[in-house]
Regions:
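A contiguous, well-structured pocket-lining segment that forms one wall/lid of small-molecule binding clefts
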Residues: 218-309, 319-324
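Glycine-rich phosphate-binding loop plus the immediately following alpha-helix
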Residues: 20, 27-34, 45-63, 135-136, ...
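Conserved beta-strand elements of the Class I
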Residues: 14-16, 174-178, 311
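Short beta-strand-loop/turn "lid" adjacent to the catalytic site in phosphate-handling enzymes
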Residues: 65-128
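Catalytic phosphate/nucleotide-handling subdomain of diverse soluble enzymes
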Residues: 6, 11, 20, 25-26, ...
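Conserved active-site and cofactor/substrate-binding residues in soluble primary-metabolism enzymes
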Residues: 10, 24-27, 56, 74, ...
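Nucleotide/phosphate-binding catalytic cleft detector across ATP-hydrolyzing
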Residues: 1-10, 96, 111-131, 141-143, ...
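Generic structural signal for well-ordered alpha-helical scaffold segments
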Residues: 84-95, 164-169, 271, 290-301
C-alpha cells in the first residue's frame, strides 16, 4: 500500500497500458507519461506498438468461446506470458527499464461477455493472467477492469468513457468518440462528466472479418480498405432482416460481444448469402455496421445532444467503404 501511495503522490507517472480487443488480431501496447491526477490529468504518449497474434494463437483464442474449462485455464496463463513479453518488447524498443515503470494496466483478452441476457447475470471473462505479467516484469499490474465495472453497477463495456472525458473534453463542444473495433462503441463527451454516456452500438468489424475468414479459409483476415465491399451491392432484404436484431432496440447503457455478433451470426449470414455474390454479402454486412451506428445516433444520442464533432478510431477507420 505504501508503494501505491508513493505512486499516487508523484507529480508524474510512467505507465504502460495493454489492450487485446474483440477483433482478436493482436495486442496494442502504449507507454505513457501521466501528469497530474483525476480530471486534471494530462497524458503524453512515449511509445506505441501493436504485436499481432500468430494465426495459430488467434484460432486458439477464438475456439475458447466453446472450449473446455481446462483449455481456458491453460490459455489464461499462455496469454499472460504473451502480454508480459509484449510489455518487455515495447520497453526495450522505447529504451526504458521495467524499474522505471510505475504500473502496468492490462485489459487482457475477452473470452465471454454477458450483458442484458434474459435470466442471466451480467458477467464477463478476460484471460491473460495479471500475476504472470507482474512476475515477469516486476511491475505493479492492474487488471480486471471489466469485472470491476460490472461490480460497480455497469455492464462491463465500454471501458473508455472516463479516459475519453479526460483526453477529449473541450469547453463549449459536444464530441462523439466512435470506436470501430470488433464491436463498435461510442462515447459522448459533453461539458460535464456526469453527462457522459457510452454504449456499444453493435457490430464493428467482427461480422466482416468472420465472413472474409470463411471465404478465404483463413488466408485473409479482413476486407482490406473495404475493397471487397466497394465492388458489391447492398441486398436490401437481408439488410432489413439484420436491422431487426433485438440488440439494436435495447436502450443504453448496453454492451455486447462475440457471443451475439460472432460465429453464430456469421454462419447464419453465410448460409443466407448462399448463391449471392460474395462482394454483395460483404457490402451488406458493411452497411449493417454503418446502419447500426447511424440508428444509435438517431435514437439514443441526437434527442439529447447536439454533437459538434465526431472522432473515429479502431481498425474500421481504415475501411473506406464503411467510412463513406
Amino acid at each position: 500500500m505504501k508503494r501505491l501511495q508513493r505512486i499516487w503522490q508523484k507529480k508524474s507517472r510512467i505507465a504502460l497500458g495493454m489492450m487485446a480487443g474483440t477483433s482478436t488480431d493482436g495486442v496494442d501496447v502504449a507507454l505513457t507519461r501521466i501528469s497530474g491526477r483525476g480530471l486534471a490529468s494530462s497524458v503524453h504518449l512515449l511509445s506505441f506498438a501493436t504485436y499481432p497474434f500468430s494465426a495459430q494463437m488467434r484460432n486458439r483464442i477464438l475456439q475458447l468461446l466453446s472450449a473446455r474449462t481446462e483449455e481456458i485455464c491453460e490459455m489464461n496463463f499462455i496469454v499472460g506470458e504473451i502480454l508480459a513479453d509484449c510489455a518487455l518488447k515495447l520497453l526495450a524498443h522505447a529504451g526504458y527499464k521495467p524499474e522505471q515503470i510505475d504500473f502496468i494496466g492490462s485489459h487482457g483478452q475477452t473470452i465471454y461477455h454477458l450483458s442484458g441476457a434474459a435470466g442471466r447475470r451480467n458477467s464477463t471473462l478476460q484471460i491473460g493472467e495479471g500475476a504472470i505479467i507482474a512476475a515477469r516484469t516486476g511491475v505493479i499490474t492492474v487488471c480486471d477492469f471489466r469485472p470491476a465495472d460490472i461490480a460497480a453497477g455497469g455492464t462491463g463495456a465500454p471501458l473508455v468513457p472516463y479516459a475519453d472525458f479526460v483526453l477529449f473534453r473541450k469547453k463549449g463542444k459536444v464530441r462523439a468518440l466512435l470506436n470501430l473495433g470488433g464491436i463498435a462503441n461510442v462515447t459522448i463527451v459533453p461539458g460535464r462528466l456526469e453527462e457522459v454516456i457510452a454504449f456499444d452500438t453493435g457490430p464493428g468489424n467482427m461480422v466482416l472479418d468472420g465472413l472474409v475468414a470463411l471465404k478465404f479459409q483463413g488466408r485473409k483476415r479482413c476486407d482490406v480498405d473495404g475493397q471487397i465491399a466497394a465492388r458489391g451491392k447492398v441486398d436490401k432484404n437481408l439488410l432489413r432482416d439484420l436491422m431487426r436484431h433485438p440488440y439494436l432496440k435495447r436502450q443504453p447503457p448496453k454492451s455486447t460481444g462475440r457471443e451475439t455478433f460472432g460465429e453464430g451470426l456469421v454462419k447464419s449470414l453465410w448460409e443466407q448469402g448462399n448463391g449471392m455474390p460474395f462482394a454483395d454479402l460483404i457490402t451488406t454486412a458493411t452497411y449493417f455496421t454503418a446502419a447500426a451506428v447511424h440508428r444509435s445516433f438517431l435514437k439514443f444520442i441526437f434527442p439529447s445532444f447536439k454533437v459538434d464533432e465526431i472522432f473515429v478510431s479502431g481498425g474500421g477507420r481504415h475501411n473506406r467503404t464503411l467510412m463513406a
